[in-house]
């Protein structure tokens, strides 16, 4: 919004410069986007009076003038302007004056000779001094303009224009009054309101149309007043034209200019109807479906039924709060009008203007909220301006009000200590009361709080933090010192990141590279990686792209596309891992976000080399997974079970448990799934991070190694092939007690001399006591106990050789 500094200072005039004023507004939250003078720089131009005009002896279109600029002798100036006359006062550029030019260097006035006649200066039109005017010729100044006065001073051309960025919540600042109110509070100065006479002293007008408001929620306050016998020969006063032009508005005709002037001055949009075009009575209602109206911009629109319109018996006259209609528009011949001033609910105006591609000053203000107590004052101001300038007569006011539907202004309780807690410094309650009172709040001070009722023009005040912001910005952000809060905080060390980093390093040491991707996935890929254990696929309401439209249920959804990308670029050996969240659930309400680590591997065990290589297998994957476990973990705590996940190979996959707690899964991607993704044999795994971190945090007591010798005993047994190695090892450990310090499988045999459906397994048992050297009898007893347990529990047969 552009606004004139001179206009602002008519309302409040602080003792500071233009730059200081702009800085004050910026620091108060009203950012100054630009600041510039009304006219570009020039010098040497004064007010002069033409005292004689004679025809040039050698040029039909030139005149020789004598001009009084307050010097001892008048200046002789040759002029070609058609409107030069004796007695007129004009801007005079004296010799040495520098006028503005498009190239920025300036145009210097020198003594000249035009067709044999000396010319000592130049009489100026508006364009020569960087102004706009619709008159072809000299800029005629008022007759009371003081001769010899610098024209910049007389016309106020050093007046600064402030281009202010108004934030959406500050609709109350879309006017001179609103900005001046802020300046008055910042500088603790009174606001100088213009004198607005009582608007009730009017003549009675029998022709005034009746008004009905059927949409009271959308329009709870509506004023209409007639003005008749308007003299249209009177032009808009220059001071009003200047104010509008400097605010970025074009001068149209006097009646339209008045409504625009009041809009900029007070912030209330008004609309004038040509009274002679109104048929019957006025009704404020919602539009009828498919009702049409031709607007002032000659655009004909079809309404849908939720737009608010001002209508007469013939149809819609205006799109309320947005733009008037052409049928009732004010023209240069209009002499009788009815003037509208109303409060329209922001919800009734919002989005309607954009629907029809309209953006008007009125809609911009009504959408953000206009003071609902302002319509009567603005109407009185406009009526006074029109009647005082044109000598017209104002008619009666028709007022339709429904206070039940006006915006409520609920009191807000502000604890005094809360201000200190948020801002960080003590502000005296009396200062808070002054600031809030000057901002228009009704303030009731209590022992430990302030009860504040927002003014009618503040639609952005609802919670105590809003009040604290108002206090802080008026008190001055520059006056609030940067003091660090004194807090006693217990900073507990969180080792999650460090432990996770150690797991990542273990995978990197085994040839894996880390991938970082979105938590979103392709719905088609999720369908391939489907299993009832993973719940439902949760779709995003606003996906960033079609291939990232759902939440991933496993990290494979992110890793497999990475594998595809690399295989398509002749990378035959691929290793990736990723840490992140997987999202499992049947709906948003039961969604579980699990921090996980996943790996994927394709290709040979090693990079291409001169020595024999081989394809990756399940045990290589198992080895890589176990690198994520602490080295000190007892293998007896680890258990594997066959996995039932549909997207894994049923014979090459497993579930991992630690201390009977489910940790994750690993195995070969199901061949059918791999085929649909154009992948070769692919090994995958995913583990939950939480149990892995718990394991890593375990504290283990340091024990002294036994100084007594170890004893090894080997046993070979025949067992059914469907009995897992893990089950047999568990049985051995339970039967052996504390003397068994280590155990491993060193031979597997199936074939000749081994019955069908069985296999021969050979185990190494390491026995050791911490207190004594074990005797042969003690070792034999312990070994026999293990063999007996295997025989009883698994029908194992001890092999002699």
From Swiss-Prot:
Keywords: Aminoacyl-tRNA synthetase, ATP-binding, Cytoplasm, Ligase, Magnesium, Metal-binding, Nucleotide-binding, Protein biosynthesis, RNA-binding, tRNA-binding. It comes from the Bacteria. Gene3D superfamilies: 3.30.56.10, Bira Bifunctional Protein, Domain 2 (3.30.930.10), Ferrodoxin-fold anticodon-binding domain (3.30.70.380), Nucleic acid-binding proteins (2.40.50.140), Phenylalanyl-trna Synthetase, Chain B, domain 3 (3.50.40.10). PROSITE patterns: B5, FDX_ACB, TRBD. HAMAP family: Phe_tRNA_synth_beta1. Its main location: cytoplasm. Residues 407-482 form the B5 domain. Residues 39-152 form the tRNA-binding domain. GO terms for biological process: phenylalanyl-tRNA aminoacylation. Its cofactor is Mg(2+). This is Phenylalanine--tRNA ligase beta subunit. It is found in: Cytoplasm. It catalyses: tRNA(Phe) + L-phenylalanine + ATP = L-phenylalanyl-tRNA(Phe) + AMP + diphosphate + H(+).
